[in-house]
Amino acid sequence: MARIFKEAPVNTIWEGSGNVMCLDVLRAMQREPELIQVLLQDFARTAATHPILSSEFDGLQQLLQTTNSNDLQFMARALVSRLVILAQAVLLLRYAPSFVAEGFIQSRYSALHGQVVGMLKPKQVDVASILQRAFSA
Protein backbone atom coordinates (compact mmCIF):
# COMPACT_ATOMS: atom_id res chain seq x y z
CA MET A 1 0.00 0.00 0.00
CA ALA A 2 2.81 2.40 0.84
CA ARG A 3 4.35 1.93 -2.60
CA ILE A 4 1.07 2.86 -4.29
CA PHE A 5 0.89 6.12 -2.35
CA LYS A 6 4.58 6.79 -2.90
CA GLU A 7 4.12 6.53 -6.69
CA ALA A 8 0.74 8.29 -6.86
CA PRO A 9 2.08 11.88 -7.16
CA VAL A 10 4.46 10.84 -9.93
CA ASN A 11 1.70 9.26 -11.97
CA THR A 12 -0.15 12.56 -12.35
CA ILE A 13 2.83 14.48 -13.70
CA TRP A 14 4.69 11.76 -15.56
CA GLU A 15 4.71 12.55 -19.25
CA GLY A 16 2.47 10.15 -21.10
CA SER A 17 0.81 8.64 -18.04
CA GLY A 18 -2.62 8.90 -19.67
CA ASN A 19 -1.40 7.02 -22.73
CA VAL A 20 0.22 4.37 -20.55
CA MET A 21 -3.01 3.85 -18.61
CA CYS A 22 -5.04 3.57 -21.81
CA LEU A 23 -2.59 1.06 -23.26
CA ASP A 24 -2.78 -0.89 -19.99
CA VAL A 25 -6.55 -1.10 -20.43
CA LEU A 26 -6.08 -2.43 -23.98
CA ARG A 27 -3.54 -4.99 -22.77
CA ALA A 28 -5.94 -6.16 -20.08
CA MET A 29 -8.71 -6.45 -22.69
CA GLN A 30 -6.47 -8.53 -24.94
CA ARG A 31 -5.11 -10.69 -22.12
CA GLU A 32 -8.54 -11.48 -20.66
CA PRO A 33 -11.19 -10.71 -23.30
CA GLU A 34 -13.91 -12.38 -21.24
CA LEU A 35 -13.61 -9.61 -18.64
CA ILE A 36 -14.59 -6.86 -21.07
CA GLN A 37 -17.57 -8.99 -22.08
CA VAL A 38 -18.64 -9.28 -18.43
CA LEU A 39 -18.28 -5.52 -18.03
CA LEU A 40 -20.28 -4.84 -21.20
CA GLN A 41 -23.00 -7.27 -20.13
CA ASP A 42 -23.24 -5.40 -16.85
CA PHE A 43 -23.45 -2.04 -18.66
CA ALA A 44 -26.06 -3.41 -21.10
CA ARG A 45 -28.73 -3.95 -18.46
CA THR A 46 -28.67 -0.35 -17.28
CA ALA A 47 -27.83 1.28 -20.62
CA ALA A 48 -30.93 -0.31 -22.14
CA THR A 49 -33.08 1.75 -19.77
CA HIS A 50 -31.91 5.09 -21.21
CA PRO A 51 -32.07 5.93 -24.94
CA ILE A 52 -28.86 7.97 -24.99
CA LEU A 53 -26.86 5.32 -23.14
CA SER A 54 -28.39 2.56 -25.21
CA SER A 55 -27.15 4.26 -28.36
CA GLU A 56 -23.69 4.89 -26.88
CA PHE A 57 -23.48 1.29 -25.68
CA ASP A 58 -24.38 -0.06 -29.13
CA GLY A 59 -21.80 2.19 -30.79
CA LEU A 60 -19.10 1.21 -28.33
CA GLN A 61 -19.84 -2.47 -28.70
CA GLN A 62 -19.73 -2.18 -32.51
CA LEU A 63 -16.42 -0.32 -32.28
CA LEU A 64 -14.92 -3.09 -30.16
CA GLN A 65 -16.19 -5.82 -32.48
CA THR A 66 -15.17 -4.25 -35.79
CA THR A 67 -11.88 -2.48 -35.06
CA ASN A 68 -8.56 -4.31 -35.34
CA SER A 69 -6.09 -4.18 -32.47
CA ASN A 70 -3.69 -1.76 -34.22
CA ASP A 71 -6.48 0.73 -34.78
CA LEU A 72 -7.72 0.28 -31.21
CA GLN A 73 -4.22 1.06 -29.99
CA PHE A 74 -4.17 4.23 -32.10
CA MET A 75 -7.48 5.35 -30.60
CA ALA A 76 -6.87 4.03 -27.07
CA ARG A 77 -7.65 7.34 -25.36
CA ALA A 78 -10.97 7.73 -27.17
CA LEU A 79 -11.97 4.14 -26.44
CA VAL A 80 -11.05 4.26 -22.75
CA SER A 81 -12.72 7.65 -22.39
CA ARG A 82 -15.94 6.23 -23.81
CA LEU A 83 -15.73 3.21 -21.49
CA VAL A 84 -15.14 5.41 -18.44
CA ILE A 85 -17.92 7.89 -19.23
CA LEU A 86 -20.35 5.05 -19.90
CA ALA A 87 -19.34 3.41 -16.61
CA GLN A 88 -19.92 6.68 -14.76
CA ALA A 89 -23.33 7.15 -16.38
CA VAL A 90 -24.38 3.58 -15.65
CA LEU A 91 -23.35 3.87 -11.99
CA LEU A 92 -25.14 7.19 -11.61
CA LEU A 93 -28.32 5.74 -13.11
CA ARG A 94 -28.15 2.91 -10.61
CA TYR A 95 -27.18 4.74 -7.44
CA ALA A 96 -27.75 8.50 -7.73
CA PRO A 97 -30.94 10.52 -7.81
CA SER A 98 -32.33 10.63 -11.34
CA PHE A 99 -31.73 14.39 -11.70
CA VAL A 100 -28.02 13.86 -10.96
CA ALA A 101 -27.73 10.97 -13.42
CA GLU A 102 -29.62 12.87 -16.11
CA GLY A 103 -27.51 15.98 -15.56
CA PHE A 104 -24.34 13.95 -16.02
CA ILE A 105 -25.66 12.16 -19.11
CA GLN A 106 -26.77 15.40 -20.74
CA SER A 107 -23.44 17.05 -19.93
CA ARG A 108 -21.52 14.25 -21.65
CA TYR A 109 -23.76 13.10 -24.50
CA SER A 110 -26.06 15.95 -25.59
CA ALA A 111 -25.49 17.80 -28.85
CA LEU A 112 -24.20 20.77 -26.85
CA HIS A 113 -21.94 18.77 -24.55
CA GLY A 114 -18.50 20.10 -23.90
CA GLN A 115 -15.51 19.80 -21.66
CA VAL A 116 -16.44 22.88 -19.64
CA VAL A 117 -19.38 23.89 -17.47
CA GLY A 118 -22.21 25.75 -19.14
CA MET A 119 -22.63 23.76 -22.36
CA LEU A 120 -26.21 22.61 -21.73
CA LYS A 121 -29.65 23.78 -22.73
CA PRO A 122 -31.36 25.47 -19.75
CA LYS A 123 -34.28 23.04 -19.50
CA GLN A 124 -32.23 19.87 -20.05
CA VAL A 125 -30.97 19.54 -16.50
CA ASP A 126 -32.57 20.10 -13.09
CA VAL A 127 -29.86 22.52 -11.98
CA ALA A 128 -31.77 23.71 -8.90
CA SER A 129 -32.01 20.18 -7.50
CA ILE A 130 -28.35 19.47 -8.21
CA LEU A 131 -27.27 22.69 -6.46
CA GLN A 132 -29.61 22.09 -3.54
CA ARG A 133 -28.20 18.59 -3.10
CA ALA A 134 -24.61 19.85 -3.32
CA PHE A 135 -25.05 22.63 -0.76
CA SER A 136 -27.30 20.81 1.70
CA ALA A 137 -24.57 18.45 2.88
Predicted feature locations:
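Flavin-dependent oxidoreductase catalytic core characteristic
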Residues: 1-137
